[in-house]
Curated annotation (Swiss-Prot):
One of its GO terms (cellular component) is cytosol. The keyword Protein biosynthesis applies. It comes from the Bacteria. Belongs to the Fmt family. It catalyses: L-methionyl-tRNA(fMet) + (6R)-10-formyltetrahydrofolate = N-formyl-L-methionyl-tRNA(fMet) + (6S)-5,6,7,8-tetrahydrofolate + H(+). The keyword Electron transport does not apply. (6S)-5,6,7,8-tetrahydrofolate binds at residues 112-115. GO terms for molecular function: methionyl-tRNA formyltransferase activity. Keywords: Protein biosynthesis, Transferase. This is Methionyl-tRNA formyltransferase.
């Protein structure tokens, strides 16, 4: 089988797992593209991405252009003379000129079963919408937003208690092997590309912090899905006594309430029950400002007065 010279473009840990699989494959990773180092942590020190750290460990050349608008960035990539470029959660837009540089084009690993959930936040939006299944699609990139021909798919169930964090981990275990298998089939001429049906497309817009503010007038089922979808970021929250309180985990109760949405019905070691537009949600793990996340029972031991019965929480 022909060994390909591959450029890899990616940034977070999810992408690094794919880079690791490529490094351990029969192919050659000749260069890595990743986003510029960013300030992180309380000290705001410049921090390398997970992909850059792995590439440096493996002594693979790393390139970190701010964008591909400059001619020099494009020339630099072309000079690598790669057979194929793999893009996984890179975070930068690639112009059509770049997509056409590698001999076999560019492949993208996308965290949904396309054409459902094209866009920036497919994993989070799938949970947010109440989908029972998602997966990963390997596609040939074109100039559109996740509109390229599909080369491989693998599905993954979304469990009842799934968070974005846990779903990322599941997909990160599945997808790298599928990527390597797809590349091998591409080399052997065994792939059959499938066009996307635009009629089935929907879009996963980027998450915003403003979305994470809980709107208690929504039904409990929807709010609970949002809490799982926004974990680990941006984390659902509400405001009480001008304090931001993040909700890390919640459950649903079968009972109904006639109370105004956002009213605390009761607070006990089993959770803080809050009335919603329809149904009751039980807040189980909270994070007070500047503190670590704790079970409600532990928080009530020291801050019970915050969660008195009848307290009305601020609406989103």
């Amino acid at each position: 089988m022909e060994k390909l010279n591959i450029i890899f473009a990616g940034t977070p840990d999810f992408a690094a797992k794919h880079l690791s699989a490529l490094i351990n494959s029969e192919h050659n990773v000749i260069a890595v593209y990743t986003q510029p180092d960013r300030p992180a942590g309380r000290g705001k020190r410049l921090t390398a991405s997970a992909v850059k750290e792995l590439a440096m460990e493996q002594q693979i050349p790393v390139y970190q252009p701010a964008n591909f608008k400059e001619v020099d960035s494009t020339k630099q990539l072309a000079a690598l003379n790669a057979d194929l470029m793999i893009v996984v959660a890179y975070g930068l837009l690639l112009p059509q000129l770049v997509l056409g540089i590698p001999r076999l084009g560019c492949l993208n690993v996308h965290g949904s079963l396309l054409p459902r959930w094209r866009g920036a936040a497919p994993i989070q939006r799938a949970i947010w919408a109440g989908d029972t299944e998602t997966g990963v699609t390997i596609m040939q990139m074109d100039e559109g937003l996740d509109t390229g021909d599909m080369l491989a798919k693998v599905s993954c169930p979304i469990e009842r208690d799934e968070t974005s964090a846990s779903l990322y981990e599941k997909l990160a275990l599945q997808a790298p092997d599928v990527l390597v298998d797809t590349i091998n089939k591409l080399v052997k001429g065994e792939l059959k590309a499938e066009k996307q049906d635009p009629q089935l497309a929907c879009y996963a817009k980027k998450l915003s912090k403003s979305e994470a503010l809980i709107d208690w007038s929504k039904d409990a089922v929807f709010i609970e899905r949002c809490i799982r979808a926004f974990n680990p970021w941006p984390v659902s929250y509400f405001v009480l006594d001008d304090k931001v309180i993040k909700v890390r985990q919640a459950g649903l109760l079968a009972t109904k309430s006639e109370q105004t949405a956002g009213t605390i019905i009761t607070a006990s070691k089993n959770g803080i029950q809050v009335a919603t537009g329809e149904g009751i949600i039980n807040l189980e793990v909270l994070q007070l400002a500047g503190k670590k996340a704790l079970p409600v029972q532990d928080i009530l031991n020291s801050r019970r007065e915050l969660f008195a019965q009848g307290t009305l929480l601020q609406q989103g």
